């Protein structure tokens, strides 16, 4: 369940809809296993919200033996609302505050339809089409 208060006015003004956890798990259960077992695979959620999908991806990667820092460093997200971005970052970090620099670069507040996907020093003029993510959710 999401950590942001979802009053009727906010939902109406932002059109945000959050994916229930059972549906997130069902979608990920149908995702090829390599996205959870290969530490070099990258994942991006262009409408990450509070991190439902990305958090579950991180959990599955760790359960498959990928070190936390490596798993975290290949997960990317974009959301248009700052409070969602903050919640996503917190969800992914847990108690690992010393890795905050990773989520500050990889989880960004922007309009995913207009964002140039500049993560961690990549070319700011690349478009989403030009970026090479191994798996996109959202």
Question: What do these predicted regions represent?
Answer:
Residues 1-138:
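SAM-dependent methyltransferase catalytic region
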């Amino acid at each position: 369940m999401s950590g942001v208060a979802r009053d009727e006015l906010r939902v109406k003004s932002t059109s945000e809809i959050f994916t229930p956890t059972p549906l997130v798990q069902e979608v990920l259960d149908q995702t090829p296993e390599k996205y959870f077992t290969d530490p070099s695979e990258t994942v991006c959620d262009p409408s990450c919200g509070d991190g439902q999908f990305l958090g579950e991806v991180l959990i599955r990667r760790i359960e498959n033996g990928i070190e936390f820092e490596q798993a975290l460093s290949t997960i990317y997200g974009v959301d248009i609302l700052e409070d969602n971005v903050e919640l996503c970052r917190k969800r992914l970090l847990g108690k690992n505050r010393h890795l905050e620099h990773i989520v500050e670069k990889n989880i960004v507040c922007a309009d995913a339809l207009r964002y140039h996907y500049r993560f961690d020093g990549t070319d700011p003029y690349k478009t989403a089409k030009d970026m090479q993510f191994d798996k996109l959710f959202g």
